[in-house]
Amino acid sequence: MNQRRVAITGLGPISALGVGMEPTWAAMLKGRCALSAIEAFDASGFDCWIGGEVRDFKANKVVPKSYRKAVKVMARDIELAVGAADAAARDAGLITKGIAEDGAEPTYPPHRMGAHIGAPLISADIDELTVAMVDSLPDDGAFDYKKFGAEGITKVTPLWLLKYLPNMLACHVTIIHDTQGPSNTITCNEASSGLSIGESLRVIQRGQADLCFCGGAESKINPLSWLRNLLTGRINTQDNDRPHQAVRPFDQSADGTITGEGGGIVILEALETLQQRGGKAYAQLLGFGASQSVNRAAHNLKPEPDGRGIASAIRAALREAQLEPGDIDMIVPFGLAHRDYDRAEAAAFQAVFGERLRDIPLVAPKAMAGSCGAGAGGLDICIAAKAIAEQTIPARINCDNPIEGLRAATAPAQAAELRHVLTCSTSLGGQNAAIVLGKMDR
């Protein structure tokens, strides 16, 4: 039996660059960095106080009126996923329960729509726990679990946990759009979005659904998340006074990343059903690969220096796409702007592409939007798909002295023949995902 072909038909990026593809693409073409001083909370006491905030976004503006009460039990991460899913569905020209007007019939039967969404460890709002924590402290000031269980927990709203379960991103998206097909949540840090997109690809290929919402979202603009990321040693704490130059992927002077919030949800559809409804697509999803890196010397807190695991995922994606390394025309890399990660990723690219690597442009969105964690791969694939559709390489910034052998130097946007584009991501835990997209006329 021939395997079903799958296309990307809707793009829903959400980040400091904007909400939806239009502002995001405009920023990518201009090379506009959106990093700035944090406003969501007072970050002045931290070693880093700049980030990539999503501004001018309110979840209740995209949630159906009948469902708006649920917004009060949505953490910021959930709100971002809901906003991205709404943008993606509208971009694909879909009618779903969440965006139907006048009782219009949905484009697809609910049982033929699925959702696989990458999610993070969601950080709680400090204000929601402060009173409970204070009531759990005895006279000596040491936290008392028994006191918390007897007194402190009574100060926590009964619905508190529903805001912070990672699967709630997918839950709210599926409820709003009434997707009753296969649904899953992937929580593998920065690899979550890529792995979720791969899961949706497999579900559609197997015929278990005709359409899937997939990708991911995360907000790292939270005091607890902020502290946790600083403790990993991956954050740039030296460039608070120049946020637009702080994230320098693949530059010899890279000094760490800057966190942000957002991600991207995309709509995948079986090509046959897409053609039946007369829809349009940005690109085909030709291949997917996943792997696990193991750096035993560093207990996985640092990447494998040789990038072996990343290379394995890329090769798997190329095999499924039935392509050779020389067929790739652009790469949207992980591009964390941390020297260990950048060099490991560069080693992986060198192992796969050899001398051809010098001719393949690398476009790293984190230089402009910061690291969106579990949502990063979703934002990356939105940019990759749009680049193929527009046959345009977005601008590259903050790389004046690139790692030897990489075409990552600062450059303006330019027209180019893009037949195939690779996206790849890795994570603090060593999970890797690689996706190959192809031009629609292939």
Listing of model-derived features with the role each one plays in the protein:
Residues 22-26, 124-142, 204-206, 226-239, ...:
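A glycine- and small-aliphatic-rich helix-loop capping segment at beta-alpha/alpha-beta transitions
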Residues 137-156, 198, 202, 218-275, ...:
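Glycine-/small-residue-rich "gating" segment that lines the acyl/pantetheine channel
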Residues 39, 210-255, 288-305, 333-343, ...:
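Acyl-CoA/ACP chain-elongation machinery
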Residues 5-9, 33-37, 242-323, 329-330, ...:
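Condensing-enzyme catalytic core mediating Claisen C-C bond formation in acyl metabolism
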Residues 1-70, 92, 272-284, 382-397, ...:
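ACP-dependent fatty acid/polyketide chain-elongation machinery
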Residues 81-94, 166-170, 174-177, 183-218, ...:
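Active-site-proximal alpha-helical scaffold in enzymes
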Residues 42, 73-79, 108-110, 160-166, ...:
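Active-site nucleophile and cofactor-binding loops and adjacent substrate-binding regions
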Residues 8, 29-177, 181-184, 217-226, ...:
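Conserved beta-ketoacyl condensing-enzyme motif
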